[in-house]
Design a protein with these regions (language model features):
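Alpha-helical transmembrane segments and their immediate juxtamembrane cytosolic regions
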Residues: 1-258
């Protein structure tokens, strides 16, 4: 437990949060977000059948529909808090991994396995090219981190230009793939890596970027309380499995049960 003494002698206590704690928090809020999209919007409201105008008209005549739409929107806002945490943990994982290739391969395999569950739950189809899952964004971010690491000793104008070019390349790739969390995730990962030792600047920039998802800045409280402890009480493969499994289960519920 960290303690800070205020101007009037008041002692403020902040919790000690481990990597496991951050992972669990991110998974829970991501689950809430997916329930909001897959179950509420796709399964109960059938949002795709409405235009914005017809939806507004339907809600004005149906209080149940309005309530469901409101709940779905709130759940998606809650999910926005997961993005900064996942970005932060990705950078931490990159810095601490003993085998980058294995790390990237595991991420890529999870991305491939997750695509059909993602399309089913988020797009309402077994196969859809309109957007791709967030693990693809993380793979691109990992490659970006490796490129940044290769040129970390390059300083001055050349070093700065290389960093910018690598960042632009990553943004282009997530845009081509239309990957979930794309621009926000890439920018956050870049900030967390490049400004690692500048906690205040890193937090301010991260909060500004996270406003893309409205509630994102709230997650920085947990990141600020992170202790650096990475001992996994829960097997890391559980987290890899959680992403495609929760998408698959909610996708099946939304499309074949409701």
């Amino acid at each position: 437990m960290n303690m800070t003494t205020g101007r009037r002698g008041i002692v403020w206590k902040t919790p000690d949060i481990t990597a496991d704690g951050l992972k669990m928090f991110a998974c829970i809020v991501m689950l809430i977000q997916t329930v909001g999209i897959a179950v509420i919007e796709k399964g109960l409201i059938h949002l795709d059948q409405y235009t914005q105008e017809s939806l507004n008209q339907a809600m004005s005549q149906d209080s149940r529909l309005m309530t469901l739409a409101g709940i779905g929107s709130i759940m998606q806002l809650i999910g926005g808090m997961a993005i900064p945490v996942f970005a932060f943990l990705l950078v931490e994982g990159f810095r601490n991994t003993s085998d980058y290739k294995k790390y990237l391969i595991m991420m890529a395999v999870t991305a491939l396995v997750s695509e059909i569950p993602y399309d089913l739950s988020i797009c309402g189809k077994v196969w859809d090219f309109s957007s791709q899952n967030a693990m693809i964004t993380m793979c691109i971010c990992l490659i970006m981190l490796k490129c940044l690491d290769l040129f970390k000793e390059t300083s001055g104008f050349t070093g700065g230009m290389l960093k910018v070019l690598i960042l632009i390349a990553a943004i282009v790739w997530v845009s081509i793939f239309r990957a979930e969390y794309g621009l926000c995730m890439v920018l956050l990962v870049f900030v967390f890596y490049v400004f690692e030792s500048k906690n205040v600047l890193k937090t301010v920039l991260g909060c500004i970027i996270s406003l893309m998802y409205v509630t994102g800045p709230i997650a920085f409280y947990g990141i600020w309380c992170y202790t650096g402890e990475r001992k996994n009480r829960i097997n890391k493969y559980v987290y890899y499995a959680f992403y495609p499994l929760h998408l698959l289960v909610l996708g099946v519920i939304a499309n074949y049960i409701l």
